[in-house]
Amino acid sequence: MTLEQELRQLSKAKARAQRNGQLCEEAVCCHQLGELLASHGRFQEALEEHQQELHLLESVQDTLGCAVAHRKIGERLAEMENYSAALKHQHLYLDLAGSLSNHTELQRAWATIGRTHLDVYDHCQSRDSLLQAQAAFEKSLAIVDEKLEGMLTQRELSEMRTRLYLNLGLTCESLQQTAQCNNYFKKSIFLAEQNHLYEDLFRARYNLGAIHWRGGQHSQAMRCLEGARECARAMKMRFMESECCMLVSQVLQDLGDFLAAKRALKKAYRLGSQKPNQRVAICQSLKYVLAVVRLQQQLQEAEGNDLQGAMAICEQLGDLFSKADDFPKASEAYQKQLHFAELLNRPDLELAVIHESLATTLGDMKDYHKAVHHYEEELRLRKGNALEEAKTWFNIGLAREEAGDAYELLAPCFQKAFGCAQQAQRYQLQRQILQHLYTVQLKLQPQEARDTEIRLQELSMAKDTEEEEEEEEEEEEEASEALETSEMELSESEDDADGLSQQLEEEEELQGCVGRRKINKWNRRNDMGETLLHRACIEGQLRRVQDLVKQGHPLNPRDYCGWTPLHEACNYGHLEIVRFLLDHGAAVDDPGGQGCDGITPLHDALNCGHFEVAELLIERGASVTLRTRKGLSPLETLQQWVKLYFRDLDLETRQKAASMERRLQMASSGQASHSSPALQTIPNNHLFDPETSPPSSPCPKPPSYTPRPPEASPAPAKVFLEETVSAVCRPRKNRHRPASSSSSSEDDDDNTNPCRPSQKRLRHSTQQGEAKTPDPSKSRETAISSACRAAYQAAIRGVGSAQSRRLVPSLPRGSNEVPAPKTALIPEEEFLAEEWLEVDTPLTRSSSSSRPSTSISDYERCPARPRTRAKQSRPASLDGWCTRTKAADASLTAEPTENSSMPRTTGPNKENCAAGQPLLLVQPPPIRVRVQIQDNLFLIPVPHSDVHSVAWLAEQAAQRYFQTCGLLPRLTLRKDGALLAPQDPIPDVLQSNDEVMAEVTSWDLPPLKDRYRRACQSLGQGEHQQVLQAMEHQSSSPSFSACSLALCQAQLTPLLRALKLHTALRELRLSGNRLGDPCATELLATLGTMPNLVLLDLSSNHLGPEGLRQLVEGSLGQTAFQNVEELDLSMNPLGDGCAQALASLLRTCPVLRTLRLQACGFSPSFFLSHQAALGSAFKDAEHLKTLSLSYNTLGAPALARVLQSLPTCTLLHLELSSVAASKSNSSLIEPVIKYLTKEGCALAHLTLSANCLSDKAVRELSRCLPSCPSLTSLDLSANPEVSCAGLEELLSALQERPQGLSFFDLSGCSIQGPLNSDLWDKILSQLQELQLCSKDLTTKDRDTLCQRLPAGACTLNQGSKLFFKCL
């Protein structure tokens, strides 16, 4: 049905509902009309329909319907780039959804708002919009995780997450948060593959391909785009496939393969475009590519016998590339032109012009120093022409300025340019040079700017004696004749040609290329460089592979990226094909070409989770020690795969991964001494094997220049082909708008099992299912006339088969869909989907491959290019590609019930035919057993694939407990008090959903180092070498220290888990790390297993009040702190809000003797909120001997409250350094005096350093000393207002006591010498140790001390220090 027919039908239904007064039905019609119009780009008309829908729903007071209408209006406004109005409606949608407490619509609303903010960023490059988009997507994701889990089907939740992950990936890519971007894209692709979400998979792969392309990673880009193209073919969305072909052509142009780019563009043209401007862009790009191809062919002809013609062609190519902003290729063309010109001994003037072109191009590439070199060469060749010398000197100055050279290098260039312009009497040029020099001087040398300004004024007043002549040379020479219409080969009749004629046309075209050698039939390749054997291996056609090899097809040809057929078979998990290829001599350790980063078939298989294939490769001698260019061995590749997908793996897959890891470790130990020499014997410096390769690699040698951003600086004015203007503009950061969630997916997912996560190289969309999952294939080989027989054969073929469940032939359809029989005459559009047999011998280039790119297993590295343009476009909105979903929303949920009557356009109609249902193997319902281990309850599925015993169940439960808690228990199981025998089969003693109790009989506790390694592996965390050394050296010590390592939470978790049940540990020091609040629970779990711990140092660990609260609340009723005697929480941002938690902590530490709370951010308001609780806790701390509150700005009032609460009879050591709130806080000493004069005060050491104390404060303190005879140590250092007067007062007071002080510190006080003899007598009689540090002490003081000290005393007399101690 055409668009007009659908519109006419819906309009009639709308009019009928209007006549009958059925407002709801009329609103439904408006909704459908709006959707249909928007899908064809008629946004204004669609907006009017949705506005009418809103009015109708408001009149019937349908709140949910109004909310959806606001969302649709917002989407249409966003598509029309009226973002402020769009956000207004979307926030109304959010408010209405909130008023209904509808979490489904709330999730949609936040996702829609985030998408619009992302559009705003594309429009105006506002970072604030990006941050708002990120926040909105995260809120939407939080609703999915916290509110919708269990409310919707798993498929709907997966589709929501898929789209949100994609949008978050795009947002992080714009924010240049590369690691997060990669993780989000991986999750999106994995979920889309797992749940057969082909439209979302297309978007993720397309956008990831665009990111790889912008990052210069062409190999990954091609594979992602090919995967996206497969999705488009599977959905029969020609416009989407056209977009992929368009972007593929851009990648191929970057690689220098313009013939392949031409074929991709022709396919894009034949497939058609949704919007007229896209079709125009394709045509113009094709004109540009055709021009390049023709010039390159002419250059091949001319290079051998016509150097003059070759030189002219190089100039035309350079001009063409320059106009296309492809400056590296333009530079190469101009360099070749210069080479030919020098061979021909062309005149200096011609050489100067070439140097100028090179300099201009290098400037566009930001390589300014090389540009200066060519400008200098031009200057040498143009000697004597004052005007040209002036322009060249001016260009040199501009280039040096862009390079950031110093003013001393810039000024002479502009001055020489000005002098030459004066000689040429060109006043306009003089003014231009002086004006620029004046600007430079204002920025770099302001004192010289005044003279230049005066010269400018004088020059402006001078009358020009002659008019300026336009000396700009006409550089727009026609590089070639206008393109003939026949050369375009784009007549509409091509659309009607059958596939055979198209293939012959391509072959004729390629055979007609000049300079092509005749190639054999096995070297016929498609756009990706794939041979017949490549395609058969990708598609899992074992019989086809066998036939090709028997007919003599080479075993090891490479595609354009460097992959061999064995790589492809391993990548897609086709076990039997791998076995066959190995039997016939395929290179088992081939590292791939330049674009493959040294990935061997074994790496490929492990990176996709194909363990059976990996096992076969190892058995056949694959090296387990070869490393990729990223330095990854096969074992490390497997560990990365497990780390990435661990949470999504089922138990069986985890067990297979663990088994494979052990296998690799064993094989590594055996191969370590004799690695396979295959790496040296396989040529990896060419893209193809010698037996089938063209003369050189199709991928050009990468230039040293970094890939230019798509938003390049304006091209030079040199143009030879006017029609290529828009074709050569590099596409900017294109994104496909995620589809709306207005309807649930109607794909039949009955047969969708959670698949093993495979990090494919993203060329063809392959879905790997479980071995027994039926696969109704749609390939031509399996299509037969009977629908029932086809479905049956497909199901039987899938049972126990290792064939790939490829995405495209396995596209899910409804259970009542009949496979359409294939006719002998293949329609043209279907031929496109399989068009690949093209004789493709690329143009002669450097033998080097494309630029090194990231490993396919690490395709996440995609550095975003800088943007210089504000406006960014999208290639096409998905609105027009699929009417099932709409733009501007990032999730999928069920449509509200009020709108459920709306018909959805989902593609081909599904007919009811029971015969079309595939025959499924019926499995009994699964057995799930609940196992209780201490406080943890685990639900463990028991697979039917084998009979498992109770011992197996105990092992599974122990592994789950280890994954959760970090400890591996040995268990016995009981059911209703009865002990279960380990050898009994589970079905004989348990039923589904039974709960059994697990008793821990013992713990598996290997050496500390091994426990740490096992915890790191379990958590997917890399080992920290310093922690590993600490574990090894301190394993038998009662003390463990990992201080000052700055370990983050992820690194601390395996450390803490390894320390669990380390019962011999008495001291744990973790100072100087980044524990933080989130890790407090993990710390508490560890402390609960250390009953003998007496010292805990958590200082400087970013622990806040929330973390302290978690420690306290979790320890209630436990023994975590029962024996702790010393606790250090210093330098943690606890703040005043921790008072309640601190009080509780004191109560949970009944034997605490030392508490250090230095620099915890306590302020004068400390003790106010929970004074009673905290005061009571301190008073009850009867064992507390040492308390440090130093470096907290408490002030006198707060200090008074603290001291009132402290026990007087037990506290011996009190540190109060730098607790004054201000310098004028003179009353600080008063609460201290009150404490010291309390009855029974037992304080022995008091620190009051750095509190701005004066002699008056010391005098007051001295008066109370006779009342506190227990005080024997006093620290008054760093109080510069304390002088000799204060010292004398204190010494006099000490004479009234039975004993003096064992320690007295006055370092940093204003003690001025020389001290009199009486004072020295008091010092030596009352003090056992004194520390003085003052610049005012004299030599006489030092001499006096040395003379008076008794025998055996120690002294330190150096600089301003004067210390002594009587032993």
Curated annotation (Swiss-Prot):
ANK repeats: 528-557, 561-590, 597-626
Composition-biased stretches (Acidic residues): 465-509
Compositional bias (Pro residues): 692-713
SUPFAM superfamilies in the record: Ankyrin repeat (SSF48403), RNI-like (SSF52047), TPR-like (SSF48452)
Subunit structure: Component of the MMS22L-TONSL complex, a complex at least composed of MMS22L and TONSL/NFKBIL2. Interacts with the MCM complex, the FACT complex and the RPA complex. Interacts with MCM5; the interaction is direct. Binds histones, with a strong preference for histone H3.1 (histones H3.1 and H3-4/H3.1t). Interacts (via ANK repeats) with histone H4; specifically binds histone H4 lacking methylation at 'Lys-20' (H4K20me0). May interact with DNAJC9; the interaction seems to be histone-dependent.
Family, as annotated: Belongs to the Tonsoku family.
Official protein name in the record: Tonsoku-like protein
Taxonomic source organism: Rattus norvegicus (Rat)
